[in-house]
Amino acid sequence: MQKICKPNLLELTKFPVQIIMENVFFEKQEMEGVQFVVRIFKTIEGAIHQIQEPQEDCWIAMTNPTATEIFEMSERFGIEVDDLRAPLDEEERSRIEVEDNYTLILVDVPMIEERNDKDWYGTIPLGIIVTKKMIFTVCLEDTQVLTRFMEGRVRNFFTYMKTRFILQILYRNATMYLHYLRIIDKKSEQVEEKLHMSTRNQELMELLELEKSLVYFTTSLRSNEVVLEKLLKVESIKQYPEDTLKIV
């Protein structure tokens, strides 16, 4: 039996970043069983709050936005429609695009898909768009990479510190990959043990699915690493003095 080649977990999650946040509210809108969510958050007097209208130094979080919402955001904030749509395409590659009035950062984030009562692991794009006055996130579905910020479970998070927020998102993303990689590693060992005592195809198929997840994760993490390296060289991303502090 061929054994899965497991990547070095520490090597795959090398991101030179720290993390951090406070309290938040949640609002959802459903349409034909699919959630379309646009939420706006802002740090007010040291705490994170959900607000009704965009303001300077706010965070606009868009989950599976409609075509109308994308067009409205594009018209209002001068962001290209294609750049707002890009994170909604599962085939989009991780990259950085620097425009005149904003910067688009695309990275892959891990996700869980349930099939046949089992959890399988894959990746979807997350877009981070940084303008001079605010920051946007765009994703096809709610991701645990961002929910910690929304649920008030990250300390010292401030929407006006855009560079720090980006690095916090990337750090959170790396920790989620590490968490899922450990689960995949453990599941692989369990399935391999079953294979020694069984000749059924079920275990072989499960092992192949886990191997596919590892390939997705490995490819995505390498692409994300390239994005991070380029990000640290982008002059349009303002560096705040506080961003260099070590947060514990």
Residue ranges of each PLM-predicted region?
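Peripheral, non-transmembrane regulatory/ligand-interaction domains of membrane transport proteins
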Residues: 2-247
